[in-house]
Amino acid sequence: MKRIGFWSITLIAILVVLCCATTALACTVVAVGKEASADGSTMVTHSCDGWYDHRVVVVPGGTHAEGEMVDIYRDPCQDTMVTPEKFGEVPQVAETYTYFNVAYPFMNEKGVLIGEHTWTGIDDVYNPEGMFVIANLEMLGLQRGSTAREVVQIMGDLAEQYGYGDGGEMLAVTDANEIWIFEIVGPGMLWKPESGEPGAHWAARRLADDEVFVGANRSRLGVIDFNDTENFMWSEGITDLPEQMGWWSEGEDFDFSKIFDSDRTGQFGSSRREWRAFDLLAPSLELPVIDGGSQYDFSIKPDEKVTMDDLFTIYNDHLEGTPYDQTVGVAAGPYGNPNRNSIKSDQIPESAQGYGFERKIAIHTCSYVFIGQARGWLPAEIGTKLWYGADDPSTTCYVPIYAGVTEVPEAWSIGDRRAFDQDSAWWAFNFVNNWAQLRWDAMYEEIHAERAKYMDQFMAEEADIDAEAAKLYEESPEKAAAFLTEYTNNAMNTVYEGWWDFAWRLVGKYYDGLCLEEDGSRTTLGMTNPDFVAASGIGETMIADMEAIYGTTTEEEAPAEEAPAEEAPAATEAPAEE
């Protein structure tokens, strides 16, 4: 195959990264240690913000023949936007596990969960000749690893052997016992696949069992303790390039984040989300507001044990009740809408150049979100499950997916993002979210009431489903898998069908600025955001005309018209027809 010049590839790749940066730098991850959770489970989350592959596909594991290869595709996470191209291949292993594929593969049958966020990092370590992007490593790690620690080591070893050709990434790799925060960047511009040198710089840090981690599109790993191999892992030769480049000197703390991430002074998109999630879980800390030039602690102890509801609340958040509340102010429009569409840089006032609207955790351009937990008192296929939500986290309805299921309904595995499709579950949630933009104040509450009908039921029956699955598991893991697959598929189909019904009910209820009640009566909802009404200029043109015409602003004060000086003569009658 003809090879394009190295620097041509580098330039193209960097341009692609920069073009995608506005959407790629947009994910939020929360991880909860087992002693920090209310029920003793580990928890991990991921909101995949931007245009990414939302389709959930179960990829079966199995045994493989010697010499079998695995195709590696570039940027598979954007498969609904562009068709990925094959970049290379690596040898397959003898046995693989079933895993769940989506933009960023997130679970396997062994109970390992992965949440992801992008942070890109400095250009000096980027190298497009590396074999893997982060989604490739997640796929291979979940196929081949049965614990979080093992998955981290597998991904790191593969990246070192074949090269990492992506920007800086963070993965929260979780099983029922521990959580590892894994971060990775490229090997440097001069690395070559045939060099025999490590093809990546990576490190991982174990989250303390009684603490909570939050990451939001910047490196959060901090200082690597090379004397603590129980709680840290790292790549071979990780200090070599930083020392050669003058980024680090022997005897200094090896701060992975400062060395490999870019300077984010004056940026708030990441730190604001970190602050908000930490503040919701530990308000007693009264964490200060910081920009991207500073870091919060790697992890914190929550004020109370964390529940699933706490995590759902975090992913509903639009900074309500804070100085940064996106539901108030002129930009929230007449109906208190927290969502902000992109604005061109030349439309931003000179005084605000370099800044933008506040970055909240829940955004309307999200592709999907999941909140997962691994419960060690049950077999992994039962104890590990995630709650998957399509589209905006604050308007979705989460559905349960157990690690042991063997398939999911087709409606959740399809959906071309370039063409509206009522056969796709994702489009149901995207449609409802878009319709809600018309009357956010009214429909947002109704959406939450509707999703509670489903989610409350799923939560209420969870203990019974777990118990029945565990009973069947003792007889046969296959029976348990069949039971969980049937349950999960029924739940997902119920929500898919119900959400389309709900969508059309909203269309028939909210239109033309009115709310149509079931009895046929119509209600004018008005404008509920006083900030917008006050700034809207309502009545200004008519007030100005009243002043111009009458010298006053009200009809009551307008002077009466004066009577004419003389009475007009009576009109002459027309002559009668003869």
Tell what function each PLM region has.
Residues 27-133, 154-306:
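A contiguous strand-loop segment
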Residues 1-11:
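Bacterial N-terminal signal peptides that target proteins for export
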Residues 14, 18-20, 559-578:
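Ser/Thr-rich, Proline-interspersed low-complexity disordered segments
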